[in-house]
């Protein structure tokens, strides 16, 4: 994804060095249109080769900077195209990988997978949109980034009641 020759090899070498030193590793993957369909394969890879990591975090994209400027190429609506994400969570979980979801509003993930969601957006950059006003899960939901706008909207947002 970074498009740099040798980047994967370098990352793997450094992960193994850090892991062998006993350092806690939180591996983060930002969900994008470019990697969404490969997420189950990545879950298999992490399960087989990176068992020493402490946590694998899959993050919904924050609508700022490069992501915002390249929305059409990067934004992936996991609320309607759920299979890759859910499949990856199943694979990771079945293989003992501690996996969590950051920046995923609870209503955008099937009920079975909400246990992976974390209230991950800092208070100072967090907001709840109109659809959240009647949601019973608002207190345990990460909500949305302050700069989240209607043109960056997941299609399947609805209150959980």
What are these regions (language model features)?
Residues 125-161:
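Radical SAM enzyme core and accessory elements
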Residues 7-9, 45-48, 75-78, 118-122, ...:
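Short, low-complexity, polar/charged sequence segments that are solvent-exposed and flexible
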Residues 24, 36-38, 55, 61-133, ...:
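A C-terminal junction/extension of Radical SAM enzymes
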């Amino acid at each position: 994804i970074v498009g740099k020759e040798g980047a994967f090899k370098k990352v793997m070498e450094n992960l193994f060095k850090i892991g062998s030193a006993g350092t806690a590793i939180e591996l983060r993957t930002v969900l994008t249109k470019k990697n969404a369909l490969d997420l189950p394969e990545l879950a298999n890879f992490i399960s087989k080769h990176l068992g020493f990591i402490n946590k694998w975090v899959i993050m919904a994209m924050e609508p700022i900077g490069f992501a915002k400027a390249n929305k059409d190429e990067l934004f992936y609506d996991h609320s309607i195209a759920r299979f890759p994400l859910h499949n990856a969570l199943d694979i990771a979980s079945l293989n003992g990988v501690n996996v969590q979801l950051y920046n995923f509003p609870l209503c955008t993930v099937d009920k079975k997978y909400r246990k992976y969601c974390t209230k991950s957006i800092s208070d100072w950059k967090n907001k709840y949109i109109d659809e959240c006003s009647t949601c019973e899960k608002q207190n345990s939901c990460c909500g949305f980034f302050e700069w989240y706008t209607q043109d960056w909207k997941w299609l399947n947002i609805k209150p959980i009641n």
